[in-house]
Design a protein with these regions (language model features):
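An acidic- and aromatic-residue-enriched active-site/binding cleft used to recognize and process polar
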Residues: 19-24, 54, 106, 131, ...
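Flexible loop/turn segments at secondary-structure boundaries
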Residues: 9, 23-28, 56-60, 136, ...
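Conserved catalytic/switch belt of AAA+ P-loop NTPases
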Residues: 2-9
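P-loop NTPase catalytic cores that bind/hydrolyze ATP
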Residues: 1, 87-171, 191-205, 241-244
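Structural recognition of the conserved hydrophobic beta-strand(s) that form the central parallel beta-sheet
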Residues: 11-26, 241
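Amphipathic alpha-helical segments of the small helical/lid subdomains adjacent to P-loop NTPase cores
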Residues: 9-12, 26-136
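Extended hydrophobic secondary-structure segments that form protein cores and membrane-embedded regions
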Residues: 1, 15-22, 48-52, 257
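Terminal-proximal interaction/regulatory segments of ATP-powered molecular machines
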Residues: 182-270
């Protein structure tokens, strides 16, 4: 405001440039109407130049980063890539999954969406791929935590949970993350396999609104196949978790959900 009202503005031109993680109006999206109007006045002093990476661009950046890291490809890479092609997942990133190893195809689809919705876009993306923070790609490799050489979806859950303090998500999106986080935090007496199921479903739920992936039994069976204990198959685990209230199945959408609530947005209506 001081810059705008300066008497010598014409003689001393000055441009203020800011880089935002969200659209300008999104920072006040969940505020009261009065604050939104005041925020709109501030927005009126700026000119927006929106920029959003395409899935192809993001996939290319991920592939180049992984190429520089020279990470060894999993032994069953060809088999997993063929399965991804059979499930018609290739178009999600407009890129061959071969270039994204050791990210499991579903992990490669989820990662950009999580970074844009719940992180800080490319900053979060490159931090996961290139840093040595706990739960990052390098940390998983150094601690021999990969699953048959793959970074799995539940690895992403653990990493983003640890770095949740740096999220720039909209309050409405952040609330959904908190709901899932609270649900899993309060889950006691579950096996490691059951926790992996819930973490995977939780991430699918967070990204399903963008059409990326949905937590149906076909995708869950594929991504959890290598982890399924012989004495406790996935179908039995899903039935047990549903009966104990940890998740629910929505038949009309063919999707498992961590939260029980409906799609009705009470906050928006109020």
């Amino acid at each position: 405001q001081l810059i705008e009202q300066s008497e010598n503005r014409k003689q001393k031109p000055l441009a203020l440039i800011t880089l935002q993680h969200l659209a300008f109006e999104d920072y006040a999206a969940d505020s009261a109407a009065l604050r939104q109007r005041e925020w709109a006045k501030i927005q009126g002093r700026f000119r927006d130049f929106p920029f959003s990476d395409s899935s192809r661009t993001t996939g290319f950046l991920m592939a180049r980063c992984l190429q520089k890291l020279a990470v060894e490809q999993p032994a069953n890479a060809s088999e997993v890539w063929a399965q991804a092609n059979g499930l018609e997942l290739v178009d999600q990133l407009s890129l061959r999954f071969e270039a994204l190893a050791p990210l499991h195809p579903l992990t490669a689809i989820l990662l950009p969406d999580l970074c844009s919705k719940y992180g800080q876009h490319e900053r979060s993306l490159f931090k996961f791929l290139g840093s040595s923070d706990e739960g990052s790609l390098q940390w998983l490799i150094n601690n021999d935590a990969l699953v048959d050489g793959w970074v799995m979806p539940w690895h992403l859950y653990d990493y983003f949970l640890a770095s949740a303090g740096s999220t720039s998500a909209l309050p409405s999106l952040a609330q959904r993350w908190i709901e899932i986080q609270t649900r899993l935090r309060d889950a006691v007496g579950l096996t490691g396999f059951e926790l992996e199921i819930l973490k995977t479903i939780g991430l699918f739920n967070l990204c399903s609104s963008s059409g990326a992936v949905r937590a149906n039994q076909q995708l869950l069976a594929w991504v959890l196949d290598a982890r399924e204990p012989e004495a406790y198959p996935l179908a039995s685990a899903l039935e047990q978790l549903s009966s104990t209230g940890f998740m629910t199945y929505r038949g009309q959408a063919d999707e498992y959900r961590i939260w029980r609530g409906s799609d009705f947005d009470l906050g928006e209506q109020v």
